[in-house]
Design a protein with these regions (language model features):
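N-terminal catalytic or cofactor-binding beta/alpha core of small enzyme domains
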Residues: 1-117, 124-136, 142-159
Length: 159
């Protein structure tokens, strides 16, 4: 049976702050009720991940980002066919566009949690700033998952 909520964290544990997405999933696994939540992780988003959106009521995609304005940015996603559409590493919006293309319907409500990163050097550990940002993101996502409704999540997008 497919669980209604998908949390997809992507990144590389061997590349410093790029590990933020998978590390947030580790936190969720230890501190949240997973009865309605499926956790999925990978190094990067790929075309096949569009099928993971099927039969979901809410989707949260989590990634590290050096472009964050805040320590963590939380926003709704819309499908958009961008230049990553034809590459091996896709943007979250492009994955949603693939879903629309193959399923001929709108994707479930999807949100992006970007966690501010500083360095993604191969072999590096998590920076202290990223560790602090991860702690803040974990607390925020925990409260999101305690109220997994579209209305509640939309109200949190000013975070």
């Amino acid at each position: 049976m497919i669980k209604p909520i998908l949390v997809f964290g992507y990144g590389n544990l061997s590349r410093g702050d790029d590990a933020l997405g998978p590390l947030l999933l580790d936190y969720i696994e230890k501190h949240c009720d997973l009865s309605k939540i499926e956790l999925l992780t990978d190094f990067q988003l790929q075309i096949e991940h569009a099928l993971d959106l099927e039969h979901r009521t809410l989707v949260l995609i989590v990634d590290a980002s050096v472009a964050c304005i805040n320590r963590c940015d939380f926003s709704p996603l819309t499908a958009a066919r961008d230049k990553s559409y034809t590459t091996h590493a896709m943007s979250p919006a492009a994955v949603l566009a693939v879903y629309v293309s193959i399923k001929k319907q709108a994707p479930p409500p999807c949100f992006l949690m970007s966690i501010k990163a500083e360095s993604m050097e191969l072999g590096a550990g998590l920076s202290s700033a990223a560790e602090n940002n991860l702690q803040q993101a974990c607390l925020f996502v925990k409260q999101l998952l305690q109220q997994p409704t579209l209305n509640h999540w939309l109200q949190q997008t000013s975070y």
